């Protein structure tokens, strides 16, 4: 005591006038003792010893759990003495300022505390020392008129990493905790740390008079400290907290420009070359007329040879054509050899890439288009006269190039075409929706891509977020009974907000079930939202510790056993467990305990398990097999006779049937662990089954069994259903962990009363177990101090009994809010089972017991939860914080919560609603990506009657899962998604994911089953819809443009002729096969045709049957006879390599021709307008074609000399040209729109205007005519084989707000 007094004296000099300052005193550091201890060698020795102990304690803390128990105990003892000295000093200081009676009572009480602690014998028993150390009370602080901060009331010896709500959290220690949003100065708790206690500046009577305002600390709860097993590392189950999810933009907005995929190019005589000219407006026109007309006049000049349509996208954000050599297959090993993909693979890969790119950028909106009025300076043509409205920066069009054209016959021809398909640009039938004007009659340049612009407008028109719809959604994310009103003003008409259609919300459901990453994002959102409310608060159970020490029970092992079962946690810990309770289907729960079962620890651990079952019933049901095992072990310690009777009568385990009946009793006295799979199959420990005669053993066992078999009430999520939020059950039925008290007004009734009944039952169980243990003669450790500890412990718990109704009411309302919200998509609780039936969610292409490829089974996250309870979880509300009172050594003492008042804010229902909308929009984009993948699969699996069959049939076998992954990765990159998040990652089960199927459905499967299951009235078994009609249209548009042989983007063709042709005119459309030619099908076994080597002449004998049925034999190359024979063969690879040299020479000599009917290629037309220059030699190309293996895509240039004779340098004479390569089909061999405008006097015979299928013009919108269909053929324009230029386009003529918000006010229904 002398040492304590010396410390007290030294410390007293440092506090001086602190009691009058109105501020709580900080603990005096040990360094201050060096300057203040001036009492001689005794004080110096005391300081040195304390400093050494402090260093030793820091070393112990760093090692966390190392077996240096004696050092820990000695340090604890010394620190307790120091803190008691500080407390005595503070109390003495206060006595000088207070009346003598108060001073006397305070000093006596604190001296009594010091007496018990200073005289305590430190227990050095190894088993007891490994338990958590006991804390000294730090709640006796000043809290009258001064503001006490959280930092003052929660001192820790060493701060640990803080859990930032809006940052990232990565905790791996089992004693690291987060902190709530309003505890910015609150340090975290370490279980094995000692604490520095703040000196008390108030007497006990003053403490009892504290008024803390209208605050509600009416929560008594339990908490199961969880440890997530992640990659073998245990961590507290706090989700990684990140910033709010920011989805990618779905719609690209193009301002003041018209997007197009095709551009007009023209070739003019003046250039004297075949180079195509890009359209550029001439300066002379800019002063006279509109840019659009100037550009149109610029490329249709007086001496224009040809005007072509070239695939050249413009004004398309984020769209980049891929002309590089792409090979999705790369290098594929086939039958032990390496397959080097040929040009066909490269061509298909390029087309797939560009198709994917086009789909990803197909959601385009056009806005801010400036309208221009045409001002005619003189009489215009019949084409321009009715056109009154133009759009600035629109694309040129041939129709607009006829103004003042020098060739009158050309203007007349264009007018005749116009009269067949009349057009206007004025707004003739304008339909307005949210300032959206739809022009169905403009004649601006429109490609098929224009339809995608219209589809985006259709998407917004059909899925606009209205105020009423938004209010319904907000109501689902708010507390029941909240008043929700819109504060929007009259400007709401300018707002264009996208509301994701139903299938997008269903995709959100699928991603929640299938993607761990996505579901973690959603859970993280709810953790943050509830944390931001500031509703929950946590406090260490120091008050109870104070009571124990005031009773002198510091030597009691029961005390450390009790607090060994009470982990120290934060608000975030509790909120995270609360969220996990609502997503219990996501986890495989394994309850564990780090406490060795002893007589002292068995009772508090049993109570902690029962509280866990009560407050977290869904998680408990998920891991009930591990809880029951622990209960059986505890009961064997607490009531051995009762356990022996149970084992003799029922056995350790009971096998249940699927309907819950007893199938078999396992009569054995061995209490073994039940595996998870056996538990899911109905094997449980006997204590968990509602046995009829259990009350014959003891009423205690019946109470425990009743808590285990408690069932949750069923609720219907009406607000969720009204908001059309996704849910796996059609009836929107769920089970409420805390009942449904949204409409309840009377406190303590209904579920509140039932919950209170179980709280009292648990308290009664604790008393009964203690009595039973105390009466066992073999138990000698439970002395009078232990009895006092247990009695105070039960009394402490009982003090909060009156708070339970308010606690359950608050938990119920928050729980019902979560279940009605958009993220709660599945109910994991089963009221017919003790242990939740295990379900693995999957995606498959079928529903049978033996499904085809495509099954994806989700392996759940395993969560290890350490059972434990917290006896002081608070709700901030509107009533007084409770007071804990008790008879403490005949002294009346009340301990109040002196924490600072924390502001409570309502749940932000608007923010939660907006977050759900953002995720649903992202799911819409995710669905577009998945639909694209599905269409790629369809292309790869093309059937014989489909356009892509021919060039995909040989490649299909190479698209194995490994090579197909290249396509998936490309889609992920282009769409900025991750389709792999819903694909298989299981190495445990035999099923693997293969998404090379065209239709998928959601299924579930029991872990021990052999096939997927479906369920009526649920989402399980239904086909997954990844898209709507608009997405389907956009995919068809992109696929039609990119993939088939009729693609206008690539000018593809099938069939090529190798034959010498000599003439004045060479043109791809001219036939080179005449009637006098002998066409013979090439077959090696054909008796009417064969090649044979002739050794005598080193030549080849060629025998064939002519049209007169006469066999003819020709010796080549010696023979000069023109046999006029054309061989017809599928691909060059079908010809034996032995004869290819002979055939090649015969083609060049003009003696033989070859038709390759199946050869596919991309062509281009070279317009030769230099008559004096020979056309390029084609010998090398003939060789390349002939020696190819077939099935390869080649680029073939066709020569057109139609306009060579019109050049200015060639005026007389006759020139002939020689060509060897010609198309088999000449019908659609050109992409020209207009040809032959080189004579201003008379119309040349070469002049031609493309038909409607290539240069269709806009037409008047009439009733019954679909503006997206051709008026003549009636077929959809996007299905035509070549681009249509007159698709009507929708533009925003005002400036709408695409990313605005609806102002909503939410008023919660009174106090929670």
Swiss-Prot record:
Basic and acidic residues composition-biased segments: 1-15, 39-49
Feature: compositional bias, Polar residues: 17-38, 56-67
Keywords: Coiled coil
Coiled coil: 74-121
Keyword rRNA-binding attributed: no
Residues covered by region (Disordered): 1-67, 145-167
Protein name per Swiss-Prot or TrEMBL: Uncharacterized protein S2
Organism this protein belongs to: Diadromus pulchellus idnoreovirus 1 (DpIRV-1)
Gene: S2
